[in-house]
Amino acid sequence: MSAKSDSRNNKAVKSDEPKKRRRKKARTAEVSDSDSSDSESDRAEEDDNEDNEDTTNHVIDEGDVEMMEFDKDDAAAAASAQTMDIPAELQSLPADSANPEFQKFYLNLVTSEFGKDMDELRTSKTFNDNTLGLLVDALKQGVNVFDEKVQGEIVQQQS
């Protein structure tokens, strides 16, 4: 048998194997005019070389494992650094800086004005414990729109 027929026989055996990722790359790669002049035997050699490269890439070295562990340490350090980036004036604020009397007044006003909308939210299929917390937090954020002086004036007017 000639070398060409051997390579064709090998191709028949390889076609029984599951397709590899390189097949997808071959379909999506752009082909220039110079590539179209390649012969079938050159393409077969390139396919064989790619097969060998695919199997060698699956071996993990100890250095790779060390790099993965290093990446995990970097991710943990980055997460802790993000919590440290909070400005000092925001860290010193209490959890709820609004006047409690004003907060009560504001939340009662909002719930009475938007009662129908809130009922629609509560009866929707997507409403659950998590979204309840989000709704409450969103309503409480409206209190922070007013500064302390305005909050005090509104509370005095209501009393």
Swiss-Prot record:
Signal peptide range: none
Main location: nucleus
One matching Pfam family: Rsa3
Gene Ontology cellular component annotations, sorted alphabetically: nucleolus; preribosome, large subunit precursor
Domain of life: Eukaryota
Region annotation Disordered: where it falls in the sequence: 1-63
Compositionally biased tracts (Acidic residues): 32-54
Coiled-coil ranges per UniProt: none
Example GO BP: ribosomal large subunit assembly
UniProt subcellular location: Nucleus, Nucleolus
Record field: transmembrane: none
Biased composition (Basic and acidic residues): 1-19
Keywords, in A-Z order: Nucleus, Ribonucleoprotein, Ribosome biogenesis
Quaternary structure note: Associates with nucleolar pre-ribosomal particles.
Function text: Required for efficient biogenesis of the 60S ribosomal subunit.
Family assignment from sequence similarity: Belongs to the RSA3 family.
Protein name as annotated: Ribosome assembly protein 3
Organism: Yarrowia lipolytica (strain CLIB 122 / E 150)
